[in-house]
UniProtKB/Swiss-Prot annotation:
GO terms for molecular function: all-trans-retinyl-palmitate hydrolase, all-trans-retinol forming activity; diacylglycerol lipase activity; monoacylglycerol lipase activity; retinyl-palmitate esterase activity; rRNA primary transcript binding; sterol ester esterase activity; triacylglycerol lipase activity. This is Hormone-sensitive lipase. The modification Phosphoserine is found at residues 552, 554, 595, 627, 649. Its EC number is 3.1.1.79, 3.1.1.23. Pathway: Glycerolipid metabolism; triacylglycerol degradation. Residues 616-627 have a biased composition (Basic and acidic residues). Monomer and homodimer. Interacts with CAVIN1 in the adipocyte cytoplasm. Interacts with PLIN5. The active site is at 424, 692, 722. The lineage of its organism: Eukaryota, Metazoa, Chordata, Craniata, Vertebrata. It comes from Ictidomys tridecemlineatus (Thirteen-lined ground squirrel).
Length: 763
C-alpha cells in the first residue's frame, strides 16, 4: 500500500470512529477516544505531504540503485510503520467497538501512545526537510558546529521521548526482536533505579530483578523512567549497564550456547617496541612503539580464538604471554592434534561505544566465526574511555595489529590473507587502524568488514541521526556521552577508589555481604513498590505514579563526586597536545603519541560531498519547492504554524555541543579524512542497519570511497537495531544478518585467483 492510500484509509477510519464515539454520550472514555481519533486524522494529514517530499528525493542519496539506503528513506519507513499500526488498530476498533469484550482502556492507552509517536515523527519529518533545504548538494550531514546541529540538540532535549519507550517500544523493528527490546528496557530502568544506591555491581543486578515487575506491567511508567535515565545519567552508568554481560554467570551462560572451540586464550602483549618492514622496500623498517597516550607504556590484551589447535598456538613463546582468567578447569578430553597453520587471520575490534565491553562480551559470535571461517581470530581488548580517551584505543589496536602481522605464526596463521573486522566503535577502529598502517608504510590488511560503523564522530545533524529520538539502544544523548568520553570531554571519576586497598579476597568478602544485604533490601523494596503501585492504580491517576517513581530513584545517581586533582597530568598533557595540533585551521595532520610525518592533512580540503550535476539540479528543484511551501528556508523556522510537538515533562536538561577539533581528526572521524588518505584503504565491505541512527555514516563513507574509485560494498539489513551481532542467536533475522557479515569476511579471506575461479561465468 503506497503512502497516500494508507493515509487516506487511516483518515477515513479515524473520521468514522470519531463520529461513533462522539455520539456515545458525555462519558470521559468516549470523549478521549473521539479526541484521539481526531488527533490521528490531523497528524496523518499533516505528515503525508512531508513524507512525500522526502521520498521524492531520497534516491539522490543512495549509493547506487541496488542499494536504496539513507536516513531519509529510514525516516519515511519508520513513519509508515507507525501509520500502519494505527491503521490496523483503527480497523480493529471499528470492527469491535460495539462488542461487550472490547477492552476500552487498553485500546485507548495504545491509541494515545501511538498518536504521541506519530506527532513526534511529524516533527522529525519537518527537521529532515530543513536538513534537505540547508545541506550542500549530496550531503547527508549538516556541515558546521552551530546552525542546524545546535538547533536540533536544543530541540532534542525538550522533545517528549517517553512514548517511544513504553507501548511503542521497537515498533519499527521486526516483531521477533521486540520482546528482547522490552526485556532490555525493563532491565535498564530497574538497573537505573538502583544505580549507586548499592556498591556491589552484582547486588545492583540482583536488586533490579525484584523491582522490575512494576515497570513490566506499566508501559507509561517505564517510558517516563527510560526517558529520564537516557537524558540525565552519565557515561559511567552506561558503562556499568553495558558491562552486565561481563558478569561471570551471564558470560558462562552465553558461552554454553555458543560454538565450542579448542583455543580461547587471553594474551598480554608486552609494551616493547619492534621493527616492521616497509611495503615499499622490505629492506627498510619502521619502529612500532608501544601505546603511550594518557597513561604511558602498558601491555595490550588480545584474545586468541581458534576452532582447531593449530601450529604455533601451543608454543612456549605464546604460552609465556598467556594471562590467567581464573582457576584452570581440568580438561578430560584427549589432547587434540595440532593442525597446520591457516592461510588466513581475522583481527577483530569489539564495539561498545568506546566506553564499554571487552572481547569476552563478543566471544560467542566470534567463536562461530572461527568455526565457519576456519581461521584464527584475535580480538583486541583496547583501553576504554573515559579513563583512556582518544587516541589510546587507536594506539593499542594499531600496536596489536602490527604485532599480529609480525607474529602470525604464533597465532596459527601464515598471514597470507588478513582481514580487519569490527562493529560500531570497532568498525571505526578498523578504518583508522588501516589508515595508520598505510601512513606508517607497513602492510595494510587485505580487506575490512565493518558492521554498522561510526565514521562521523563530530556533532552533525543528519536524517538517520533523527532516529535516535526513538531508538531504545542508541539514543542521541547516550551517543553524545560516549563520543564526548572518547574525545576526552568527560571527566574521569572513580567512586570506588578504595577497592585497590581491599585486595582480591577483601573485594569478594565485601561483595558477598553486600549481595546478601541487597537481596534482603530488594525483596522488601519489591513488596513495597508493588503495594504502592497497586494503590496508585486503584486511584486511576497517572501523574502521581510518575512523580512517586521519580522520587524513588536515588538522586545520587544524578551527581558524581569529583575525582582527585593532580592525578591525570599525563592524560591532560595528551589532550592539550591533541587540541593544539588538531586545529581545523591547519593543514597538518595532528601528531599522535606515535608521530608520523607523512599522514596527510587533517582538514579534508579535498573532501567532495557533491552530487553529479544532473542530480544536483534535481535536488535544487526539490529545495525550491520546500522553500515555497514553508515560506522560507531559514533555520530559525522550526515547524509550520499550528503544529506543536509534544514536550518532555522531565525538566530542562543540558546536552552541550562538543566541538573540539579532536573530533574532526581523520583518525577519529574517518569520514572527514582527505581523499589521499582514503585512497590507501583496502577493499571495504560495510554491513549497515536500515533503522540505525548511524546509517548515514555508512552511506556517506561508501559514497566517498566509490567516488574515489575504491572497491567498496554496502549491504543494508532491514528491520534490525544497531548491535545485531551481539544478538546473533536471538532470532532468524539476526542470524541471517550475522551470516552476511561472515560472507563478507570470507570474501576478503579468499585469494583473488580463487575468487575469480569461483565466480559464475558472465551471461
Amino acid at each position: 500500500m503506497d503512502l497516500r492510500t494508507m493515509t487516506q484509509s487511516l483518515v477515513t477510519l479515524a473520521e468514522d470512529n470519531m463520529a461513533f464515539f462522539s455520539s456515545q454520550g458525555p462519558g470521559e472514555t468516549a470523549r478521549r477516544l473521539s479526541n484521539v481519533f481526531a488527533g490521528v486524522r490531523e497528524q496523518a494529514l499533516g505528515l503525508e505531504p512531508a513524507l512525500g517530499s522526502l521520498l521524492s528525493v531520497a534516491h539522490l542519496f543512495d549509493l547506487d540503485p541496488e542499494t536504496p539506503a539513507n536516513g531519509y528513506r529510514s525516516l519515511v519507513h519508520t513513519a509508515r510503520c507507525c501509520l500502519a499500526h494505527l491503521l490496523h488498530k483503527s480497523r480493529y476498533v471499528a470492527s469491535n467497538r460495539r462488542s461487550i469484550f472490547f477492552r476500552t482502556s487498553h485500546n485507548l492507552a495504545e491509541l494515545e501512545a501511538y498518536l504521541a509517536a506519530l506527532t513526534q515523527l511529524r516533527a522529525l519529518a519537518y527537521y529532515a526537510q530543513r536538513l534537505l533545504a540547508t545541506n550542500r548538494p549530496g550531503g547527508l550531514f549538516f556541515e558546521g558546529d552551530e546552525g542546524l546541529t545546535a538547533d536540533f540538540l536544543r530541540e532534542y532535549v525538550t522533545l517528549h521521548k517517553g512514548c517511544f519507550y513504553g507501548r511503542c517500544l521497537g515498533f519499527q523493528f521486526t516483531p521477533s526482536i521486540r520482546p528482547f527490546l522490552q526485556t532490555i528496557s525493563i532491565g535498564l530502568v530497574s538497573f537505573g533505579e538502583h544505580y549507586k544506591r548499592n556498591e556491589s555491581g552484582l547486588g545492583v543486578t540482583a536488586s533490579s530483578l525484584f523491582t522490575s515487575g512494576r515497570f513490566a506491567i506499566d508501559p507509561e511508567l517505564r517510558g517516563a523512567e527510560f526517558e529520564r535515565i537516557t537524558q540525565n545519567l552519565d557515561v559511567h552508568f552506561w558503562k556499568a549497564f553495558w558491562n552486565i554481560t561481563e558478569i561471570e554467570v551471564l558470560s558462562s551462560l552465553a558461552n554454553m550456547a555458543s560454538a565450542t572451540v579448542r583455543v580461547s586464550r587471553l594474551i598480554s602483549l608486552p609494551p616493547e617496541a619492534f621493527e616492521m618492514p616497509l611495503t615499499s622496500d622490505p629492506k627498510l623498517t619502521v619502529t612500532i612503539s608501544p601505546p603511550l597516550a594518557h597513561t604511558g607504556p602498558g601491555p595490550v590484551l588480545i584474545r586468541l580464538i581458534s576452532y582447531d589447535l593449530r601450529e604455533g598456538q601451543d608454543s612456549e613463546e605464546l604460552n609465556s604471554m598467556v594471562k590467567s582468567e581464573g582457576p584452570r578447569i581440568l580438561e578430560l578430553r584427549p589432547r587434540p592434534q595440532q593442525t597446520s597453520r591457516s592461510r588466513s587471520l581475522v583481527v577483530x575490534f569489539h564495539g561498545g561505544g568506546f566506553v564499554a565491553q571487552t572481547s569476552k562480551s563478543h566471544e560467542p559470535y566470534l567463536k562461530s566465526w572461527a568455526q565457519e571461517l576456519g581461521a584464527p581470530i584475535i580480538s583486541i581488548d583496547y583501553s576504554l574511555a573515559p579513563e583512556a580517551p582518544f587516541p589510546r584505543a587507536l594506539e593499542e589496536c594499531f600496536f596489536a595489529y602490527c604485532w599480529a602481522v609480525k607474529h602470525c605464526a604464533l597465532l596459527g596463521s601464515t598471514g597470507e590473507r588478513i582481514c580487519l573486522a569490527g562493529d560500531s566503535a570497532g568498525g571505526n577502529l578498523c578504518f583508522t587502524v588501516a589508515l595508520r598502517a598505510a601512513a606508517y608504510g607497513v602492510r595494510v590488511p587485505d580487506g575490512i568488514m565493518a558492521a554498522y560503523p561510526a565514521t562521523m564522530l563530530q556533532s552533525a545533524a543528519s536524517p538517520s541521526r533523527l532516529l535516535s529520538l526513538m531508538d531504545p539502544l542508541l539514543p542521541l544523548s547516550v551517543l553524545s556521552k560516549c563520543v564526548s568520553a572518547y574525545a576526552g570531554a568527560e571527566t574521569e571519576e572513580h567512586p570506588n577508589s578504595d577497592e585497590k586497598a581491599l585486595g582480591m579476597m577483601g573485594l569478594v568478602r565485601r561483595d558477598t555481604s553486600l549481595l546478601l544485604r541487597d537481596l534482603r533490601l530488594g525483596a522488601s523494596s519489591w513488596l513495597n513498590s508493588f503495594l504502592e503501585f497497586s494503590g496508585q492504580k486503584s486511584q486511576k491517576t497517572s501523574a502521581p505514579t510518575v512523580e512517586s517513581m521519580r522520587r524513588s530513584v536515588s538522586e545520587a545517581a544524578l551527581a558524581q563526586p569529583e575525582g582527585p586533582v593532580g592525578t591525570d597530568s599525563l592524560k591532560i598533557l595528551t589532550l592539550k597536545d591533541l587540541n593544539l595540533k588538531s586545529s581545523s585551521e591547519t593543514s597538518e595532520t595532528p601528531e599522535m603519541s606515535l608521530s608520523v610525518e607523512t599522514l596527510g592533512p587533517s582538514t579534508p580540503s579535498d573532501v567532495n560531498f557533491f552530487l553529479r550535476p544532473e542530480d544536483a539540479r534535481e535536488e535544487a528543484e526539490a529545495k525550491e519547492g520546500l522553500s515555497a511551501k514553508d515560506g522560507s528556508s531559514r533555520v530559525s523556522n522550526a515547524f509550520p504554524e499550528g503544529f506543536h510537538p509534544r514536550r518532555t515533562s522531565q525538566g530542562a536538561t543540558q546536552m552541550p555541543l562538543y566541538s573540539s577539533p579532536i573530533v574532526k581528526n581523520p583518525f577519529m572521524s574517518p569520514l572527514l579524512a582527505p581523499d589521499n588518505m582514503l585512497k590507501t584503504l583496502p577493499p571495504v565491505h560495510i554491513v549497515a542497519c536500515a533503522l540505525d541512527p548511524m546509517l548515514d555514516d555508512s552511506x556517506m563513507f561508501a559514497r566517498r570511497l566509490r567516488a574515489l574509485g575504491q572497491p567498496v560494498t554496502l549491504r543494508v539489513v532491514e528491520d534490525l537495531p544497531h548491535g545485531f551481532l551481539s544478538l546473533a542467536s536471538l532470532c532468524r533475522e539476526t542470524r541471517q544478518a550475522a551470516e552476511l557479515c561472515v560472507e563478507r569476511i570470507r570474501l576478503i579471506l579468499t585469494p583473488p585467483a580463487a575468487a575469480a575461479a569461483a565466480a559464475p561465468p558472465p551471461l
